[in-house]
Amino acid sequence: MSRKSQNRLAPRAWSFSRGSFLALVLAWFLLVPGSALAGEPRGDATIFIYHHFGDERYPTTNVGMDQFREQMAYLAVHDYQVIPLAELVASLHDGKPLVPKTVVITIDDGYRTIFSEAWPVLRKYGFPFTVFLYVEGLERGYPNYLTWDQVEEMAAAGVDFQDHSYSHHRLADWPPGMKEVEYRRWIRADLARGAAIMERRLGVKPRFFAIPYGEYNDVVLSEARKAGYEAAFTQDAGSVSDDTELFLIPREPILGTDWASLEHFRQVLERIDLPFADMTPDFAPLRENPPARFGARLLYPERYRSDSFGIFVSELGWQQAILEGDWVYIDNETSLNRRINRVMISARERDSGRTALRFWMLTNPSAP
């Protein structure tokens, strides 16, 4: 094995304020000029995550159907290999090199427009896809969600269904005053309930877990492993490489206006992973505030242009980073006030000029 080891009825992806959301969009577009799209493809994969299809009631998590058709046509015309999620996970688990231009399509929550809008398009192209189900939404018959009859029809036709938890709680929100043993028990019970219902309904125990809202900490990931899942998926943007951790697999959200455009879709496909380890701060609940430093140890520092490294923190924006040996970092004196921050390290690949990046998440239990 390689190094990888609405409202209530409408769970939303990405818990950013509008300002930080737009700041992140701007940072990405600044980092990916047209020249970065050149070069031979490396064996990285892209996992897309969708939510609503053709449902303008939910503009922040919706993709228009004209946009979706255009995106699927782009994959077909440009010879991208759209593979089942299980095939990608098997490659990571076995240390098998990834094939260039590999794509996986995932859809979170289980809204009814998957059945009425997305499935006919995906079936037209013969593209496999995985739906991560918010189990309580189906069990209680919430409006806009798939019915179990629809799920069973799709499953019989080969659609893959996996677990997105029972309650869709923000599992990384460690309740104040709750002891760790109680916190773990709460997470464990929710995961077990959702998985048991899926197994009873579909006859198969779910193998993969998409973390609700993409929000995690070390306890959430630990309990996902203990629950018997083979892999866990975040909503951190980024590509998948041979060095991707099995319980921190990133996915690229396609939603809203800018992030559902074909331009953004193409840019996402051209990005590559930037493998690193020993992040500071790591993704355990924040222990020091302000964090004295943001950074990580690069696994392959020689791959990248030494003057191209930058670090983005949701609350602080993008800064030019310092590279010392295999360490890349920025020093910091500013306290973090948000409950969730995402940290990104980015650079330009030396040979191709393409943008390489990777994210991780910080949780701040003391935030209001």
Question: What role is predicted for each listed range?
Answer:
Residues 1-17:
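N-terminal secretory signal peptides that target proteins for export/translocation
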Residues 20-33:
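Bacterial N-terminal signal peptides
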Residues 36-103, 269-281, 352-368:
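N-terminal pre-catalytic segment of deacetylase/amide-hydrolase enzymes
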Residues 43-59, 78-81, 99-103, 111-219, ...:
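Metal-dependent polysaccharide deacetylase catalytic core of the NodB/CE4 family, i.e.
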Residues 229-238:
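Acidic, His- and aromatic-enriched active-site or binding-groove loops in soluble protein domains
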Residues 254-289:
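Short, compositionally biased P/S/T/A/G/V-rich stretches that sit at domain boundaries
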Residues 276-368:
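Beta-strand-enriched, solvent-exposed domains that form extended recognition/catalytic surfaces
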